[in-house]
Amino acid sequence: MTLNELKDGQKAIIVNLNAHKELKNRLLSFGFIKNKNLKKIHSSLKNATIMVELDTSCVILRSDEAKTIEVNLI
């Protein structure tokens, strides 16, 4: 399952980042690391952007970026 498939309010753990090097480095700098818990807060209309809570931070990703983050529901 990928991050963009989560429903608003669902919690998950990051399993893998399936992104190219530049995007992977960007995601890592935001705190998207393997085995980290996250919560999907909100999706925009038509799922174009996704707001995610990581620890005490909120990050907004494009749908294409969220598709590269593999997660498991908690």
From Swiss-Prot:
Full protein name: Putative Fe(2+) transport protein A
Swiss-Prot/TrEMBL keywords: Ion transport, Iron, Iron transport, Transport
Highest taxon of the lineage: Bacteria
Function: Might be involved in Fe(2+) ion uptake.
Record gene name: feoA
Induction: Detected in iron-restricted, mid-log-phase cells, part of the feoA-feoB operon (strain NCTC 11168).
Keyword Ion transport: yes
Gene3D superfamilies: 2.30.30.90
UniProt GO molecular function: transition metal ion binding
Annotated InterPro entries: Fe-transptr_FeoA-like (IPR007167), FeoA_core_dom (IPR038157), Transcriptional_repressor_C (IPR008988)
Organism in which the protein naturally occurs: Campylobacter jejuni subsp. jejuni serotype O:2 (strain ATCC 700819 / NCTC 11168)
Family: Belongs to the FeoA family.
GO biological process assignments: iron ion transport
Upper lineage: Bacteria, Pseudomonadati, Campylobacterota, Epsilonproteobacteria, Campylobacterales
Database matches in Pfam families: FeoA
